[in-house]
Amino acid sequence: MSEKPPSDVPLPYADRPVATAPGHWVLARAGKRVLRPGGAALTAAMLDHARLPGSDVVELAPGLGRTAAEIVAARPASYTAIDRDPQAAARVAAVVGDRGVVRQGEAADTGLDDACADVVVGEAMLTMQGDKSKAAIVAEAARVLRPGGRYAIHELGVAPDDIDEEYYTQLRRDLARAIHVNARPMTAAAWRGLLEDAGLVVDWVDTAPMALLKMSRNLRDEGPGGAARIMWNVMRDKALRARVMEMRRTFTRYEKDMVGIALVAHKPEAGAGTAPEEAGAEGSSPGA
């Protein structure tokens, strides 16, 4: 195991003022540990469909390492994480210890061998990319997967598929202003299309409410102690409180339009046909 516990490793952007730091790292400063748009339940469902035990797993941009801990607990054959941020990489290395390998690198150019992984996992990172970068990262995931391997993603979605384009543009602008990241969430149809354009076959799709700052979600994901920690940190720090409230107002304004969405797709064998996808029960994750 690492000599340093995760709490002793600085958060990414820790030297940047709260007023200008990316929203997800602001929430991490507040003490939030589950930063995925659909919550821990949607992540758990995604990992279950990815079939981790005995697999060689690669995780792209693992962030705080919360999902990394769940992956290594599932007893994969191997675990490799790729993160461009040295502080994030250090935190994940502290989480997985000798149960995995963490490398600093780019999600679109991992440096890994062709067909070296059974599963590639990525959460809440494609949303932050433009169209070309999204496609490049998905292509890289497809490259490192073995035939039959699974690509599992958990991202921010918008609904419905035929959302008004002008309204969608305003949603994106307001979201970018609130979180200080040029986030580009997509419809379920667009997320499916992104994976299919890389030659992958979508097997499973599920959604959950985007309730990142709702008390019920925090109690479920963080536990009573974690939720209390977040509330205390926010209440005692004026700048932190202002940023969190700004994000909360935007999330509330668009709560009917945004969802957490998870998909699992596989890389087909050469010459294999496609199979119909499996949708989650009534399109939502249990307990989300």
Annotate each PLM feature:
Residues 16, 21-40:
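Class I SAM-dependent methyltransferase Rossmann-like catalytic core
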Residues 36-53:
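Conserved alpha-helix/loop element of class I SAM-dependent methyltransferases that forms part
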Residues 54-63:
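Conserved class I S-adenosyl-L-methionine
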Residues 64-109:
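Class I SAM-dependent methyltransferase SAM/SAH-binding core
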Residues 108-120:
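A short acidic, Gly/Pro-enriched loop at the edge of an enzyme's catalytic core
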Residues 135-150:
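A short glycine-rich, Lys/Arg-flanked "PGG" loop and its adjoining helix->strand segment in the class I
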Residues 148-210:
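Conserved catalytic/acceptor-binding region of the Class I
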Residues 204-288:
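Conserved Class I S-adenosyl-L-methionine
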